Amino acid sequence: MAKDNLTNLLSQLNIQLSQDEHSQVEQTCVKLLDSGCENPADVFRRCLVAVIQQDKYQKALHYLKKFKHIDDKYGRKFALEKLYIFYKLNMPDEFNTLYTAIITDDLDTVLKKDIESLRGILHVRAQYCYKNGLYQEAFKIYQHLASHNEKDQDSQIELSCNERVPLSVATELMNRSPLVTPMDESSYDLLFNESFIMASVGKYDKAIELLEKALQGATNEGYQNDINTIKLQLSFVLQMVGKTAQSKEILKGLLQELKADSPFSLICQNNLNAFVDFSKYNTNFNLLLRELNVEKLNTFNLQTFTHEQWSNIQRNVLFLRLFNNVKIHSQESLLSRTFDKYSKLVDNVTLESYKTQAKKLYHHTTKTILSGTDGSTIGILLLTIQLLIIEKEWENAIRIGELFLNESWKSSFEKFNDSQAIVCYILFELYKIKGRNNSKSVLLKKLGSVRVQLSGKIQENIPFWKHVGFELLSMGNAKESKALLREISNFSKGDADVLVDRVVSSDSLDIAQGIDLVRDIDIDKLIQLGVKPLESSAKRSKNTAVSKVQKRKVLELKKKRKIKRLEKFLQGRDTSKLPDPERWLPLRDRSTYRPKKKQQGAKQTQGGAMNKKSEQALDISKKGKPTVNKKPKNKKKGRK
């Protein structure tokens, strides 16, 4: 692939020189600027272009500071070059300040005007948006540029690649607007980008097929950097389908070819360690962090990695440091803020029991939700629910999830976001585990109100609302389920969902059609992945924690049974007769006790009655002398 996707944007500068010639142009321009030339704006622009062609962006920034007086006076004439420098150096504040100064209108207004002079600015803006995670804006700009290329200002292949790049991360954007550029299998760049989309939607076999074609094309042209990039993506997709041996073989081969301190090598090392099952008790995390070369990783930023790559690397490092009991400081990311609170609440992440951790986080998260559901509340909530599920405290997990939704929907249902959708997914699963159909009905009713308030904006999260539609169907509410799924099918302009179409259609589904729908499902593989078959509530394991409500019901039932036993005991008894006040004393110690005549009292019982014969037997003074044996002793003769 090309080093950047801005080919022909800077072609208007009319500089097509070698590396040494670019350096000579740079030196000549600097001398002219120092001597005070007549047209400093044009000379300074040529100087910036020569430095950009050499990929010396820090040096370009140095010249912007050195010749600030020229920048202040003629800055609008080389605004494109300045934006490109800020984009490559990952300077978002400077980039946004300059961009808003150039384009004062909102994006939709600018795209409607279709100003030809802003085409280069929009290209750089789209690249910046993709690199910083603004995928929706990047996709919108790329689609506009691709659909307004009648004069062939840009390469059609590059526009096709650029349009597909945001979809590799945010595939749901295709639901709002289909692709405007066709697929051309002659370009391995386009095959590579298309494989990302296939992998994102779970079509891994198709992704592998496209990657193998792209790898063959890159090998034929001999671009080693592109070959390594395609191999890395191929190893990832092979790992996703369970072909770990092939994936490891590719990664090990890449590590042998690449330099140890290169960013590409560090990504391969991270992916190879993803196959290892770490233990928070036995793993030496200090050694692992050193092997991953985390210090070197932290020297890179978005200049080297994309937004998604950089986020994944930082998340992995945060997890390793958390289980290494290293202090984690709260930063911009949701995960770092969550781990910061978690490490403060828990004394020792690796040694403290999950039960204690779940109890601490449950009380803390409850207070946090009551004070507000915005910010990083969703992070600490998900961590709390995970710990509660590990300890099988299902009711507490349900209770805290419902509290989050109730507080979020306290004022209105209009502010529905991804955090609420995630909690709804979790609650549906927990309701299924506990068999709480009534609670599921209440949640579905609230989601119906949310759907009304959204006023047709459900296309922003079609997978979630499709899930809600099938949950309605499982509860027997076929009318609302069909209405929701019919609305979803109108938004789905891409691949048709056969199952949704069957539910929406009024035709009945016979046995043969049902068999065709499930013919390709691998049951054994689903069971291996942890999917449990449907079973009745009577067969479910009852070894679950008893909630407070269930405990109260059990106590009330015991109390009723006790009352019935007492009523049965009192039948045929004189209730007016008072109980014996000495009933707590032993029988022989009571004043009413009278022993039988022939019964001999116990000799060692304190306070026991004793007859006369027994007393005489114990009187030592009346005993006679012991009898003496008067028979002489026979003396045995000894042996001589």
Swiss-Prot record:
Question: For this protein, what is any one GO molecular function term?
Answer: 7S RNA binding
Looking up InterPro entries in the UniProt record yields: Signal_recog_part_SRP72_RNA-bd, SRP72, TPR-like_helical_dom_sf
Q: GO CC annotation: what is one?
A: signal recognition particle, endoplasmic reticulum targeting
| Compositional bias of kind Basic and acidic residues | 574-592, 612-622
Q: Which Gene3D superfamilies match?
A: Tetratricopeptide repeat domain (1.25.40.10)
Q: Where is this region: Disordered?
A: 574-640
Keywords carried by this UniProt record: Cytoplasm, Endoplasmic reticulum, Membrane, Nucleus, Ribonucleoprotein, Signal recognition particle, TPR repeat
Source organism, top-level taxon: Eukaryota
Q: Which Pfam families match?
A: SRP72
For this entry, list what GO says about its biological process.
SRP-dependent cotranslational protein targeting to membrane; SRP-dependent cotranslational protein targeting to membrane, signal sequence recognition
Location(s), subcellular: Cytoplasm; Endoplasmic reticulum membrane; Nucleus, Nucleolus
Q: Where are the TPR repeats?
A: 188-221
What are the Basic residues biased-composition ranges? Answer: 623-640
Keyword check for Glycosyltransferase: no
Give the primary localization class: cytoplasm
Reported function: Component of the signal recognition particle (SRP) complex, a ribonucleoprotein complex that mediates the cotranslational targeting of secretory and membrane proteins to the endoplasmic reticulum (ER). The SRP complex interacts with the signal sequence in nascent secretory and membrane proteins and directs them to the membrane of the ER. The SRP complex targets the ribosome-nascent chain complex to the SRP receptor (SR), which is anchored in the ER, where SR compaction and GTPase rearrangement drive cotranslational protein translocation into the ER.
| Oligomeric form and interacting partners | Component of a fungal signal recognition particle (SRP) complex that consists of a 7SL RNA molecule (scR1) and at least six protein subunits: SRP72, SRP68, SRP54, SEC65, SRP21 and SRP14. At least SRP14, SRP21, SRP68 and SRP72 are proposed to get assembled together with scR1 RNA as a pre-SRP complex in the nucleolus which is exported to the cytoplasm.
Which protein family is named in the record? Belongs to the SRP72 family.
Misc. remarks from the entry: Present with 11800 molecules/cell in log phase SD medium.
Designated name of the protein: Signal recognition particle subunit SRP72
Q: Which gene encodes it?
A: SRP72
